[in-house]
């Protein structure tokens, strides 16, 4: 299973809304688009059109990860996921694992601490240790669902990423730029600014001197 960025967002939204707003689930295309474009609890924030969401939905339907549902007497088609925990799904996840996968689909790589803080509407973890235990279970499967990313400079915890989407495989495993390199780059930039300003001031002073000389010559010719 490999999801595009848009497909991962659609699945993540359906998983989330099934738990947090069950009275509104399944979702219409309009509701699903609004969920995909939320400004909060989404990373990155997207601005998908209904057409783009429909394309993702149609693709997921072909992959048998979404099903359509029409209410009696209503023409509005609504969508529900078949990603996990349904009679048609091979994938069965515990509530804790579902919460972690959902958050990673919606918000990208996160630390165990971030997952615990952000999961309260999906699942209540007692502590970070419980989150870490669940992460290990998801990583130790025959086909892992998560992987650990190299720890970034300045972070106490490593981040984890889901392995269902194509975007996760594009993440660089290399460490980010070293702090010394960053500081050096900033120092060069700061040094460059005064040099540019000094050059500009010198040019202006030269122009003023030339104008003053011409003015003096003009006054002399008139006297």
UniProtKB/Swiss-Prot annotation:
HAMAP family listed in its UniProt record:
UPF0502
Cystine crosslinks = none
SUPFAM superfamilies assigned: Winged helix' DNA-binding domain (SSF46785)
What's the name of the protein? UPF0502 protein Sbal223_2520
State the InterPro entries in the record: DUF480, WH-like_DNA-bd_sf, WH_DNA-bd_sf
Give the top-rank taxon of the lineage listed in the UniProt record for this protein. Answer: Bacteria
Similarity remark: Belongs to the UPF0502 family.
């Amino acid at each position: 299973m490999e999801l595009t960025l848009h497909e991962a967002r659609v699945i993540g939204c359906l998983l989330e809304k099934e738990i947090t707003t069950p009275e509104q689930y399944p979702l219409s295309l309009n509701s699903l688009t609004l969920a995909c474009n939320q400004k909060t609890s989404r990373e990155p924030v997207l601005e998908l059109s209904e057409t783009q969401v429909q394309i993702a939905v149609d693709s997921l339907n072909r992959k048998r990860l979404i099903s359509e549902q029409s209410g009696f007497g209503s023409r509005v088609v609504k969508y529900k996921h078949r990603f996990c925990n349904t009679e048609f799904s091979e994938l069965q996840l515990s509530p804790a694992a579902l919460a972690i996968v959902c958050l990673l689909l919606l918000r990208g790589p996160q630390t165990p601490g971030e997952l615990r803080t952000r999961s309260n509407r999906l699942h209540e973890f007692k502590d970070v240790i419980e989150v870490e235990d669940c992460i290990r279970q998801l990583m130790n499967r025959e086909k892992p669902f998560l992987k650990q990313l190299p720890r970034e400079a300045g972070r106490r915890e490593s981040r984890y990423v889901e392995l269902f989407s194509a975007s996760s495989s594009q993440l660089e495993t290399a460490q980010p730029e070293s702090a010394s390199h960053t500081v050096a780059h900033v120092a060069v930039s700061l040094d460059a600014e005064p040099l540019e300003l000094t050059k500009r001031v010198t040019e202006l002073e030269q122009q003023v001197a030339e104008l003053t000389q011409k003015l003096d010559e003009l006054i002399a010719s008139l006297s």
